[in-house]
Curated annotation (Swiss-Prot):
Broad class of enzyme this protein falls into: hydrolase
Subcellular localization, as worded in the UniProt entry: Secreted; Secreted, Cell wall
EC number in record: 3.4.-.-
Chief subcellular location: secreted
Protein name, UniProt field: Peptidoglycan DL-endopeptidase CwlO
Entries under PANTHER family matching the protein: MUREIN DD-ENDOPEPTIDASE MEPH-RELATED
A GO cellular component entry from the record: extracellular region
Signal peptide limits: 1-30
Tree of life domain: Bacteria
InterPro entries, per database record: NLP_P60_dom, Papain-like_cys_pep_sf, Peptidase_C40
Length: 473
Protein backbone atom coordinates (compact mmCIF):
# COMPACT_ATOMS: atom_id res chain seq x y z
CA UNK A 1 0.00 0.00 0.00
CA UNK A 2 2.81 2.42 1.02
CA UNK A 3 4.66 1.74 -2.23
CA UNK A 4 1.58 2.52 -4.31
CA UNK A 5 1.01 5.79 -2.41
CA UNK A 6 4.63 6.89 -2.98
CA UNK A 7 4.21 6.13 -6.68
CA UNK A 8 1.02 8.20 -6.75
CA UNK A 9 2.76 11.14 -5.01
CA UNK A 10 5.69 11.07 -7.44
CA UNK A 11 3.33 10.95 -10.39
CA UNK A 12 1.53 13.99 -9.02
CA UNK A 13 4.78 15.96 -8.55
CA UNK A 14 6.04 15.00 -12.01
CA UNK A 15 2.69 15.96 -13.54
CA UNK A 16 2.76 19.35 -11.82
CA UNK A 17 6.38 19.98 -12.85
CA UNK A 18 5.65 19.19 -16.48
CA UNK A 19 2.89 21.77 -16.37
CA UNK A 20 4.93 24.47 -14.63
CA UNK A 21 7.89 24.43 -17.00
CA UNK A 22 6.03 25.75 -20.08
CA UNK A 23 4.26 28.27 -17.82
CA UNK A 24 7.59 29.88 -16.92
CA UNK A 25 7.91 32.00 -20.06
CA UNK A 26 4.35 33.23 -19.69
CA UNK A 27 4.98 34.52 -16.18
CA UNK A 28 8.21 36.14 -17.25
CA UNK A 29 6.45 37.62 -20.26
CA UNK A 30 3.68 39.05 -18.08
CA UNK A 31 6.17 40.90 -15.87
CA UNK A 32 8.20 42.00 -18.90
CA UNK A 33 5.02 43.29 -20.56
CA UNK A 34 4.18 45.27 -17.41
CA UNK A 35 7.57 46.94 -17.61
CA UNK A 36 7.14 47.50 -21.35
CA UNK A 37 3.71 49.06 -20.81
CA UNK A 38 5.13 51.36 -18.13
CA UNK A 39 7.90 52.45 -20.51
CA UNK A 40 5.37 53.03 -23.31
CA UNK A 41 3.12 55.09 -21.03
CA UNK A 42 6.13 57.09 -19.83
CA UNK A 43 7.18 57.71 -23.43
CA UNK A 44 3.58 58.63 -24.34
CA UNK A 45 3.62 61.23 -21.58
CA UNK A 46 6.91 62.64 -22.88
CA UNK A 47 5.63 62.74 -26.48
CA UNK A 48 2.35 64.38 -25.41
CA UNK A 49 4.31 67.06 -23.53
CA UNK A 50 6.56 67.57 -26.56
CA UNK A 51 3.54 67.90 -28.88
CA UNK A 52 1.95 70.45 -26.54
CA UNK A 53 5.19 72.46 -26.38
CA UNK A 54 5.69 72.31 -30.16
CA UNK A 55 2.08 73.35 -30.85
CA UNK A 56 2.52 76.29 -28.50
CA UNK A 57 5.77 77.14 -30.29
CA UNK A 58 4.00 76.90 -33.67
CA UNK A 59 1.24 79.26 -32.47
CA UNK A 60 3.86 81.77 -31.32
CA UNK A 61 5.68 81.48 -34.65
CA UNK A 62 2.43 82.05 -36.56
CA UNK A 63 1.65 85.10 -34.42
CA UNK A 64 5.18 86.38 -35.00
CA UNK A 65 4.83 85.85 -38.75
CA UNK A 66 1.54 87.80 -38.77
CA UNK A 67 3.28 90.60 -36.87
CA UNK A 68 6.16 90.62 -39.36
CA UNK A 69 3.69 90.63 -42.28
CA UNK A 70 1.97 93.72 -40.82
CA UNK A 71 5.32 95.44 -40.26
CA UNK A 72 6.33 94.59 -43.82
CA UNK A 73 3.10 96.11 -45.14
CA UNK A 74 3.59 99.29 -43.08
CA UNK A 75 7.20 99.65 -44.23
CA UNK A 76 6.24 98.91 -47.82
CA UNK A 77 3.48 101.57 -47.68
CA UNK A 78 5.97 104.08 -46.27
CA UNK A 79 8.49 103.14 -48.94
CA UNK A 80 5.89 103.64 -51.68
CA UNK A 81 4.81 107.00 -50.22
CA UNK A 82 8.45 108.08 -49.91
CA UNK A 83 9.13 107.00 -53.47
CA UNK A 84 6.19 109.10 -54.70
CA UNK A 85 7.43 112.09 -52.69
CA UNK A 86 10.90 111.64 -54.15
CA UNK A 87 9.45 111.69 -57.66
CA UNK A 88 7.45 114.84 -56.81
CA UNK A 89 10.54 116.53 -55.37
CA UNK A 90 12.60 115.58 -58.40
CA UNK A 91 9.94 117.08 -60.63
CA UNK A 92 9.83 120.22 -58.46
CA UNK A 93 13.62 120.37 -58.54
CA UNK A 94 13.66 120.16 -62.34
CA UNK A 95 10.91 122.78 -62.59
CA UNK A 96 12.75 125.16 -60.24
CA UNK A 97 15.95 124.72 -62.21
CA UNK A 98 14.04 125.50 -65.41
CA UNK A 99 12.54 128.65 -63.85
CA UNK A 100 15.98 129.75 -62.69
CA UNK A 101 17.30 129.16 -66.17
CA UNK A 102 14.46 131.21 -67.65
CA UNK A 103 15.01 134.07 -65.16
CA UNK A 104 18.69 134.12 -65.91
CA UNK A 105 17.84 134.47 -69.58
CA UNK A 106 15.42 137.36 -68.85
CA UNK A 107 18.00 139.02 -66.65
CA UNK A 108 20.55 138.80 -69.45
CA UNK A 109 18.03 140.25 -71.93
CA UNK A 110 17.18 143.10 -69.54
CA UNK A 111 20.84 143.75 -68.96
CA UNK A 112 21.31 143.82 -72.74
CA UNK A 113 18.48 146.37 -73.16
CA UNK A 114 19.83 148.51 -70.36
CA UNK A 115 23.26 148.35 -71.90
CA UNK A 116 21.84 149.32 -75.29
CA UNK A 117 19.89 152.22 -73.80
CA UNK A 118 22.94 153.34 -71.92
CA UNK A 119 24.84 153.46 -75.19
CA UNK A 120 22.13 155.68 -76.72
CA UNK A 121 22.18 158.00 -73.72
CA UNK A 122 25.95 158.09 -73.83
CA UNK A 123 25.79 159.12 -77.50
CA UNK A 124 23.32 161.87 -76.70
CA UNK A 125 25.41 163.18 -73.89
CA UNK A 126 28.49 162.96 -76.08
CA UNK A 127 26.63 164.80 -78.87
CA UNK A 128 25.56 167.52 -76.50
CA UNK A 129 29.07 167.89 -75.23
CA UNK A 130 30.49 168.07 -78.71
CA UNK A 131 27.95 170.71 -79.74
CA UNK A 132 28.51 172.81 -76.67
CA UNK A 133 26.14 171.22 -74.32
CA UNK A 134 23.28 173.59 -73.62
CA UNK A 135 23.96 175.47 -76.87
CA UNK A 136 22.37 172.61 -78.71
CA UNK A 137 19.19 172.89 -76.73
CA UNK A 138 19.22 176.71 -77.32
CA UNK A 139 19.63 176.21 -81.04
CA UNK A 140 16.64 173.90 -81.02
CA UNK A 141 14.60 176.46 -79.14
CA UNK A 142 15.79 179.47 -81.21
CA UNK A 143 15.03 177.62 -84.36
CA UNK A 144 11.36 177.87 -83.55
CA UNK A 145 9.24 179.94 -85.94
CA UNK A 146 6.79 181.18 -83.34
CA UNK A 147 6.25 181.29 -79.64
CA UNK A 148 3.97 178.30 -79.79
CA UNK A 149 6.66 176.44 -81.71
CA UNK A 150 9.13 177.49 -79.04
CA UNK A 151 6.96 176.11 -76.30
CA UNK A 152 6.47 172.87 -78.19
CA UNK A 153 10.18 172.49 -78.81
CA UNK A 154 11.00 173.20 -75.16
CA UNK A 155 8.42 170.65 -74.01
CA UNK A 156 9.70 168.06 -76.45
CA UNK A 157 13.27 168.45 -75.32
CA UNK A 158 12.22 168.15 -71.67
CA UNK A 159 10.08 165.07 -72.43
CA UNK A 160 12.94 163.33 -74.19
CA UNK A 161 15.24 163.87 -71.25
CA UNK A 162 12.61 162.74 -68.73
CA UNK A 163 11.72 159.71 -70.88
CA UNK A 164 15.33 158.64 -70.97
CA UNK A 165 15.53 158.98 -67.21
CA UNK A 166 12.31 156.99 -66.63
CA UNK A 167 13.37 154.26 -69.02
CA UNK A 168 16.67 153.85 -67.28
CA UNK A 169 14.96 153.78 -63.89
CA UNK A 170 12.40 151.19 -65.04
CA UNK A 171 15.09 149.01 -66.51
CA UNK A 172 17.02 149.15 -63.24
CA UNK A 173 13.85 148.16 -61.33
CA UNK A 174 13.16 145.26 -63.69
CA UNK A 175 16.68 144.05 -63.30
CA UNK A 176 16.47 144.22 -59.49
CA UNK A 177 13.15 142.39 -59.51
CA UNK A 178 14.56 139.63 -61.70
CA UNK A 179 17.57 139.29 -59.46
CA UNK A 180 15.27 139.00 -56.41
CA UNK A 181 13.26 136.31 -58.18
CA UNK A 182 16.45 134.46 -59.03
CA UNK A 183 17.56 134.59 -55.38
CA UNK A 184 14.17 133.26 -54.27
CA UNK A 185 14.34 130.45 -56.78
CA UNK A 186 17.87 129.58 -55.68
CA UNK A 187 16.66 129.39 -52.06
CA UNK A 188 13.74 127.25 -53.17
CA UNK A 189 16.09 125.00 -55.14
CA UNK A 190 18.25 124.50 -52.05
CA UNK A 191 15.16 123.57 -50.01
CA UNK A 192 13.95 121.15 -52.68
CA UNK A 193 17.36 119.53 -52.96
CA UNK A 194 17.65 119.21 -49.15
CA UNK A 195 14.18 117.61 -48.98
CA UNK A 196 15.09 115.33 -51.87
CA UNK A 197 18.30 114.21 -50.12
CA UNK A 198 16.35 113.55 -46.91
CA UNK A 199 13.75 111.51 -48.81
CA UNK A 200 16.43 109.52 -50.60
CA UNK A 201 18.09 108.74 -47.23
CA UNK A 202 14.70 107.69 -45.88
CA UNK A 203 14.17 105.51 -48.94
CA UNK A 204 17.50 103.75 -48.34
CA UNK A 205 16.60 103.18 -44.68
CA UNK A 206 13.20 101.79 -45.65
CA UNK A 207 14.80 99.51 -48.23
CA UNK A 208 17.16 98.24 -45.52
CA UNK A 209 14.21 97.62 -43.18
CA UNK A 210 12.36 95.79 -45.93
CA UNK A 211 15.34 93.52 -46.55
CA UNK A 212 15.66 92.77 -42.83
CA UNK A 213 11.94 92.07 -42.45
CA UNK A 214 11.97 89.88 -45.55
CA UNK A 215 14.77 87.87 -43.97
CA UNK A 216 12.86 87.57 -40.68
CA UNK A 217 9.73 86.57 -42.58
CA UNK A 218 11.60 83.82 -44.44
CA UNK A 219 13.13 82.60 -41.16
CA UNK A 220 9.69 82.55 -39.50
CA UNK A 221 8.27 80.52 -42.38
CA UNK A 222 11.19 78.07 -42.20
CA UNK A 223 10.76 77.72 -38.42
CA UNK A 224 7.04 77.10 -38.85
CA UNK A 225 7.72 74.44 -41.45
CA UNK A 226 10.32 72.78 -39.21
CA UNK A 227 8.02 72.89 -36.16
CA UNK A 228 5.03 71.59 -38.14
CA UNK A 229 7.20 68.71 -39.36
CA UNK A 230 8.31 67.97 -35.78
CA UNK A 231 4.66 67.94 -34.63
CA UNK A 232 3.76 65.58 -37.46
CA UNK A 233 6.60 63.24 -36.50
CA UNK A 234 5.63 63.39 -32.82
CA UNK A 235 2.01 62.60 -33.66
CA UNK A 236 3.17 59.65 -35.75
CA UNK A 237 5.26 58.50 -32.79
CA UNK A 238 2.26 58.96 -30.48
CA UNK A 239 0.13 56.88 -32.84
CA UNK A 240 2.79 54.16 -32.94
CA UNK A 241 3.03 54.19 -29.13
CA UNK A 242 -0.76 53.90 -28.88
CA UNK A 243 -0.61 50.86 -31.17
CA UNK A 244 2.22 49.36 -29.11
CA UNK A 245 0.26 49.94 -25.91
CA UNK A 246 -2.87 48.37 -27.40
CA UNK A 247 -0.85 45.35 -28.57
CA UNK A 248 0.83 45.07 -25.17
CA UNK A 249 -2.51 45.23 -23.36
CA UNK A 250 -3.92 42.60 -25.71
CA UNK A 251 -0.91 40.37 -25.03
CA UNK A 252 -1.29 40.98 -21.28
CA UNK A 253 -4.95 40.01 -21.46
CA UNK A 254 -4.05 36.84 -23.37
CA UNK A 255 -1.32 35.87 -20.89
CA UNK A 256 -3.56 36.68 -17.93
CA UNK A 257 -6.24 34.42 -19.36
CA UNK A 258 -3.71 31.62 -19.81
CA UNK A 259 -2.35 32.19 -16.31
CA UNK A 260 -5.82 32.05 -14.80
CA UNK A 261 -6.45 28.79 -16.64
CA UNK A 262 -3.08 27.46 -15.46
CA UNK A 263 -3.75 28.57 -11.88
CA UNK A 264 -7.12 26.83 -11.99
CA UNK A 265 -5.45 23.66 -13.20
CA UNK A 266 -2.79 23.89 -10.49
CA UNK A 267 -5.50 24.34 -7.87
CA UNK A 268 -7.31 21.32 -9.25
CA UNK A 269 -4.10 19.29 -9.05
CA UNK A 270 -3.44 20.51 -5.51
CA UNK A 271 -6.95 19.46 -4.49
CA UNK A 272 -6.33 16.06 -6.06
CA UNK A 273 -3.03 15.81 -4.15
CA UNK A 274 -4.78 16.78 -0.93
CA UNK A 275 -7.41 14.09 -1.52
CA UNK A 276 -4.59 11.62 -2.19
CA UNK A 277 -2.88 12.60 1.08
CA UNK A 278 -6.13 12.12 2.99
CA UNK A 279 -6.55 8.68 1.38
CA UNK A 280 -2.97 7.84 2.38
CA UNK A 281 -3.69 8.82 5.99
CA UNK A 282 -6.86 6.70 6.06
CA UNK A 283 -5.00 3.70 4.58
CA UNK A 284 -2.21 4.14 7.15
CA UNK A 285 -4.68 4.15 9.99
CA UNK A 286 -6.39 1.04 8.58
CA UNK A 287 -3.04 -0.74 8.21
CA UNK A 288 -2.12 0.15 11.80
CA UNK A 289 -5.44 -1.19 13.11
CA UNK A 290 -5.07 -4.41 11.18
CA UNK A 291 -1.49 -4.81 12.42
CA UNK A 292 -2.65 -4.26 15.99
CA UNK A 293 -5.31 -6.91 15.65
CA UNK A 294 -2.79 -9.36 14.21
CA UNK A 295 -0.41 -8.60 17.07
CA UNK A 296 -3.13 -9.24 19.67
CA UNK A 297 -3.92 -12.54 18.05
CA UNK A 298 -0.25 -13.56 18.26
CA UNK A 299 -0.15 -12.54 21.96
CA UNK A 300 -2.95 -14.89 22.85
CA UNK A 301 -1.31 -17.86 21.15
CA UNK A 302 2.39 -17.51 22.07
CA UNK A 303 4.18 -15.60 24.86
CA UNK A 304 7.65 -15.44 23.31
CA UNK A 305 6.20 -14.59 19.93
CA UNK A 306 4.06 -12.01 21.69
CA UNK A 307 7.15 -10.25 23.09
CA UNK A 308 8.83 -10.28 19.70
CA UNK A 309 5.68 -9.04 18.01
CA UNK A 310 5.22 -6.32 20.58
CA UNK A 311 8.82 -5.15 20.05
CA UNK A 312 8.30 -5.06 16.33
CA UNK A 313 4.96 -3.29 16.68
CA UNK A 314 6.42 -0.70 19.03
CA UNK A 315 9.33 -0.07 16.71
CA UNK A 316 7.00 0.33 13.75
CA UNK A 317 4.65 2.55 15.69
CA UNK A 318 7.47 4.77 16.92
CA UNK A 319 8.90 5.12 13.43
CA UNK A 320 5.51 5.96 11.99
CA UNK A 321 4.83 8.45 14.74
CA UNK A 322 8.23 10.08 14.26
CA UNK A 323 7.69 10.49 10.52
CA UNK A 324 4.22 11.90 10.98
CA UNK A 325 5.48 14.39 13.57
CA UNK A 326 8.34 15.49 11.29
CA UNK A 327 5.96 16.07 8.38
CA UNK A 328 3.70 18.14 10.60
CA UNK A 329 6.58 20.35 11.73
CA UNK A 330 7.76 20.98 8.18
CA UNK A 331 4.36 22.04 6.98
CA UNK A 332 2.88 23.71 10.04
CA UNK A 333 2.31 27.48 10.24
CA UNK A 334 2.41 29.80 13.23
CA UNK A 335 5.79 28.60 14.55
CA UNK A 336 8.82 30.87 14.44
CA UNK A 337 12.04 28.85 14.30
CA UNK A 338 14.76 29.83 16.76
CA UNK A 339 18.09 29.96 14.96
CA UNK A 340 20.32 32.91 15.86
CA UNK A 341 22.61 32.49 12.85
CA UNK A 342 19.96 31.33 10.40
CA UNK A 343 18.98 34.77 9.11
CA UNK A 344 22.50 36.04 8.38
CA UNK A 345 23.51 32.62 7.08
CA UNK A 346 20.61 32.54 4.61
CA UNK A 347 21.24 36.13 3.48
CA UNK A 348 24.96 35.44 3.07
CA UNK A 349 24.37 32.30 0.99
CA UNK A 350 21.67 33.95 -1.13
CA UNK A 351 23.72 37.12 -1.71
CA UNK A 352 26.67 35.04 -2.91
CA UNK A 353 24.87 34.25 -6.20
CA UNK A 354 23.43 37.72 -6.91
CA UNK A 355 23.71 38.34 -10.64
CA UNK A 356 24.85 34.74 -11.24
CA UNK A 357 21.61 32.75 -11.03
CA UNK A 358 19.00 32.84 -13.82
CA UNK A 359 15.31 32.59 -13.00
CA UNK A 360 13.37 29.46 -13.94
CA UNK A 361 9.71 29.06 -13.07
CA UNK A 362 9.40 25.75 -11.23
CA UNK A 363 13.20 25.55 -10.92
CA UNK A 364 15.16 24.56 -7.81
CA UNK A 365 13.09 21.47 -7.18
CA UNK A 366 15.60 18.94 -8.51
CA UNK A 367 19.15 18.27 -7.37
CA UNK A 368 20.40 19.19 -10.83
CA UNK A 369 18.77 22.65 -10.63
CA UNK A 370 20.09 23.18 -7.11
CA UNK A 371 23.61 22.19 -8.14
CA UNK A 372 23.40 24.64 -11.06
CA UNK A 373 21.86 27.33 -8.84
CA UNK A 374 18.69 27.57 -10.92
CA UNK A 375 15.64 28.59 -8.88
CA UNK A 376 12.32 30.37 -8.90
CA UNK A 377 11.42 32.79 -6.08
CA UNK A 378 10.10 30.27 -3.53
CA UNK A 379 12.71 27.55 -4.13
CA UNK A 380 15.46 30.19 -3.81
CA UNK A 381 14.17 31.31 -0.40
CA UNK A 382 13.83 27.66 0.75
CA UNK A 383 17.37 26.83 -0.46
CA UNK A 384 18.95 29.93 1.17
CA UNK A 385 17.41 29.15 4.56
CA UNK A 386 18.03 25.39 4.20
CA UNK A 387 21.72 26.18 3.57
CA UNK A 388 21.71 27.99 6.94
CA UNK A 389 20.04 25.06 8.73
CA UNK A 390 16.46 26.38 8.64
CA UNK A 391 13.88 24.03 7.10
CA UNK A 392 10.99 25.86 5.40
CA UNK A 393 9.64 22.82 3.57
CA UNK A 394 10.52 19.95 1.25
CA UNK A 395 12.53 20.51 -1.92
CA UNK A 396 9.73 19.57 -4.28
CA UNK A 397 6.80 20.94 -2.33
CA UNK A 398 7.74 24.49 -1.27
CA UNK A 399 5.81 27.27 -3.05
CA UNK A 400 4.70 30.80 -2.21
CA UNK A 401 1.42 29.25 -1.07
CA UNK A 402 3.21 27.08 1.52
CA UNK A 403 5.68 29.79 2.57
CA UNK A 404 2.90 32.31 3.24
CA UNK A 405 1.60 29.88 5.87
CA UNK A 406 4.97 29.59 7.63
CA UNK A 407 5.96 31.44 10.79
CA UNK A 408 3.89 34.33 12.10
CA UNK A 409 2.33 37.29 10.31
CA UNK A 410 3.80 40.71 11.17
CA UNK A 411 2.78 44.15 9.98
CA UNK A 412 4.81 45.85 7.28
CA UNK A 413 5.75 48.58 9.75
CA UNK A 414 7.35 45.98 12.04
CA UNK A 415 9.15 43.84 9.48
CA UNK A 416 12.85 43.29 10.03
CA UNK A 417 15.86 41.65 8.41
CA UNK A 418 15.18 38.01 7.51
CA UNK A 419 11.38 38.27 7.28
CA UNK A 420 9.65 36.93 4.17
CA UNK A 421 7.90 39.58 2.05
CA UNK A 422 5.21 38.64 -0.49
CA UNK A 423 4.03 40.41 -3.65
CA UNK A 424 0.90 40.11 -5.78
CA UNK A 425 2.37 39.56 -9.25
CA UNK A 426 0.62 37.10 -11.54
CA UNK A 427 -1.54 36.04 -8.57
CA UNK A 428 -2.04 36.87 -4.90
CA UNK A 429 1.26 36.29 -3.06
CA UNK A 430 2.77 35.16 -6.37
CA UNK A 431 6.31 36.32 -5.49
CA UNK A 432 8.44 36.08 -2.30
CA UNK A 433 11.78 37.47 -1.12
CA UNK A 434 13.90 37.92 2.03
CA UNK A 435 13.74 41.40 3.57
CA UNK A 436 17.21 42.93 4.10
CA UNK A 437 16.26 46.19 5.81
CA UNK A 438 16.38 49.80 4.56
CA UNK A 439 13.59 49.07 2.09
CA UNK A 440 15.48 46.39 0.13
CA UNK A 441 14.96 42.66 -0.31
CA UNK A 442 16.83 39.66 -1.73
CA UNK A 443 14.87 37.68 -4.32
CA UNK A 444 14.92 35.67 -7.55
CA UNK A 445 12.80 37.38 -10.25
CA UNK A 446 12.10 36.96 -13.95
CA UNK A 447 13.89 40.15 -14.99
CA UNK A 448 17.29 39.83 -13.29
CA UNK A 449 17.38 36.42 -11.63
CA UNK A 450 18.81 36.57 -8.09
CA UNK A 451 19.13 40.26 -7.20
CA UNK A 452 18.70 42.87 -4.49
CA UNK A 453 15.77 45.19 -5.28
CA UNK A 454 14.16 48.22 -3.72
CA UNK A 455 10.63 47.96 -2.40
CA UNK A 456 10.14 51.58 -3.45
CA UNK A 457 10.56 50.57 -7.10
CA UNK A 458 7.17 51.44 -8.70
CA UNK A 459 6.58 47.84 -9.82
CA UNK A 460 7.36 46.23 -6.46
CA UNK A 461 5.71 49.04 -4.51
CA UNK A 462 2.45 48.46 -6.39
CA UNK A 463 2.67 44.67 -5.94
CA UNK A 464 3.44 44.73 -2.20
CA UNK A 465 0.20 44.48 -0.19
CA UNK A 466 1.77 44.31 3.27
CA UNK A 467 2.02 40.51 3.59
CA UNK A 468 5.06 39.72 5.81
CA UNK A 469 5.89 36.43 7.60
CA UNK A 470 8.51 35.98 10.33
CA UNK A 471 9.90 32.44 10.07
CA UNK A 472 13.16 32.77 12.01
CA UNK A 473 14.29 34.77 15.01
Amino acid sequence: MRKSLITLGLASVIGTSSFLIPFTSKTASAETLDEKKQKIESKQSEVASSIEAKEKELTELQENQSKIEKELKDINDKALDTSNKIEDKKEENDKTKEEIKKLKKEIKETEARIEKRNEILKKRVRSLQESGGSQGYIDVLLGSTSFGDFISRATAVSSIVDADKDLIKQQEQDKAKLEDSEADLNDKLKEVQAALAKLETMQKDLDKQLNEKDKLFDEAKASQKKTAKAISELKSEASELANQKANTEAEQARIKKEQEAAAALIKKQEEAQKASDETQTDDSQTATTESSKASSSDDSSDNSSDNSSNGSSNSSSNGSSSKKSSGSNSNSGGTVISNSGGIEGAISVGSSIVGQSPYKFGGGRTQSDINNRIFDCSSFVRWAYASAGVNLGPVGGTTTDTLVGRGQAVSASEMKRGDLVFFDTYKTNGHVGIYLGNGTFLNDNTSHGVSVDSMSNPYWKAAFKGVVRRVVQ
